[in-house]
Amino acid sequence: AGVYSDKYDSIDDIPNGAKVAVPNDASNTARCYLMLQKIGWIKLDENADPSAITQDDITENPHNIKFTEMNSMTIPATMADFDYVAITGSVVYNAGIDASTALANEDIQEYLVLQVVVKKENKDAAWAQAIVDAYHSDEFKEYMKKNNDGLWWIPEELQ
């Protein structure tokens, strides 16, 4: 996830009472509020479950930010209505936004890393091994180097 703006060039420019859009689905809402805490815009309840953070967990909001939680996929189309928006990499990609224009990015949380999983009885199936082989192939590594553009976190063994 990253912070983007059509109005400001820095996260340091945040005005008092800024309007900020964040995703309204539970996992991405939590990710974005954690990112906004990381950049110093808010403070969150230290006892809150990091995977389930909501607006109710904000304990300090020194910039008096007005948050609007909305469908992630609609955020890019409404950027002009907000001072800043917080959006995930997949939404950035789908909207054709240049990921390098992010003013801030989240720290990757280990529990959010996506994985391909199969039932135990399928782990040695030819199709499952084909996925593993493709994922670890030089072609995939090269493709990700060329096409990642900062949108996705890539494990070190694939870089």
What role is predicted for each listed range?
Residues 1-42, 141:
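A conserved helix-loop-strand patch within extracytoplasmic ligand-binding domains
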Residues 75-99:
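A ligand-binding cleft/hinge motif common to bilobed small-molecule-binding domains
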